[in-house]
């Protein structure tokens, strides 16, 4: 499996003429279930837009089938059953051997005990890889010994699953990141990013990004951050850039349409927002 070199944000837009597929990462998206089938697709589409060379989805068959039927860009491995479980470890381990450089896990996964057991075992089997924990995977985060290569993306409510504080502030987010020895992106009206040493607030001065508070936008944010990590950015840089780009895109749509847009509409404006943030 690949071990991407750490890149600077300034290196992400302009690539060497000698670049080949997989030089800028292979992201594995693991998630989905019978009734929550869209999250892995949103993860994958956002990840491609954010520049990663290859995205592979591993999901229960309904979620995988929906993903490939929606877009020919998607590679999806359909797994048996309605939810993820330890019986899928062998299949996913074989996928990871194919130059995977980061794993995004949790979107639409559901909260079955067997799914949580699967997440913990998968993480423990591949501690050399960056893992991005989002959504339902955060509900078993207390069972995982994270490291500085990982990123957790809780919303305000989910923050309480991993922190002794229910309220995200600069102090509480930095303290929690230090405690779990990893990176946090706490999303909300103000996003907080910390690696335990630094903390940064991501705000929208226009007030128009408020309409991001709808289902699906978090899956897009997770896909962007995971894509940047898979390409070689540090989790802290990836989280700062990803959060700022999605807020920028949300504000652009909000100025034009107010709350009247689909989460997938963010995908149309993300390229300009990413160029804006990566070009700083």
Where are these regions (language model features)?
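Non-cysteine beta-strand/loop elements that form the S-adenosyl-L-methionine
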Residues: 148-156
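Small-residue (G/A/S/T)-rich helix-start motifs and N-terminal tracts that mark the onset
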Residues: 1-130, 139-148, 161-280
């Amino acid at each position: 499996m690949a071990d991407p070199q750490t890149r600077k944000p300034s290196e992400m837009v302009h690539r060497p003429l000698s670049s080949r597929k997989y030089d800028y990462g292979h992201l594995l998206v693991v998630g989905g279930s019978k009734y929550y089938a869209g999250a892995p697709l949103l993860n994958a589409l956002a990840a491609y837009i954010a520049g990663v060379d290859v995205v592979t989805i591993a999901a229960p068959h309904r979620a995988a089938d929906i993903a490939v039927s929606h877009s020919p860009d998607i590679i999806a491995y359909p797994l048996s059953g309605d939810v993820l479980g330890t019986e899928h470890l062998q299949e996913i381990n074989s996928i990871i051997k194919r130059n995977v450089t980061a794993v995004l896990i949790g979107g639409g996964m559901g909260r079955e005990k067997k799914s949580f057991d699967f997440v913990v075992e998968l993480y423990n089997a591949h501690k050399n890889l960056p893992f991005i924990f989002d959504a339902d995977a955060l509900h078993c985060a207390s069972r995982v010994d994270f490291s500085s290569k990982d990123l957790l993306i809780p919303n305000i409510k989910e923050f309480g699953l991993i922190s002794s504080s229910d309220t995200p502030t600069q102090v509480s987010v930095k303290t929690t990141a230090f405690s779990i020895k990893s990176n946090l992106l706490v999303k909300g009206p103000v996003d907080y990013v910390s690696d335990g040493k630094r903390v940064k607030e991501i705000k929208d001065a226009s007030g128009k990004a408020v309409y991001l508070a709808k289902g699906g936008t978090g899956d897009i944010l997770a896909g962007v951050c995971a894509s940047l990590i898979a390409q070689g950015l540090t989790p802290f840089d990836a989280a700062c850039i990803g959060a700022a780009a999605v807020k920028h895109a949300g504000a652009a749509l909000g100025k034009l349409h107010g709350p009247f847009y689909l989460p997938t509409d963010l995908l149309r404006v993300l390229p300009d927002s990413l160029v804006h943030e990566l070009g700083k």
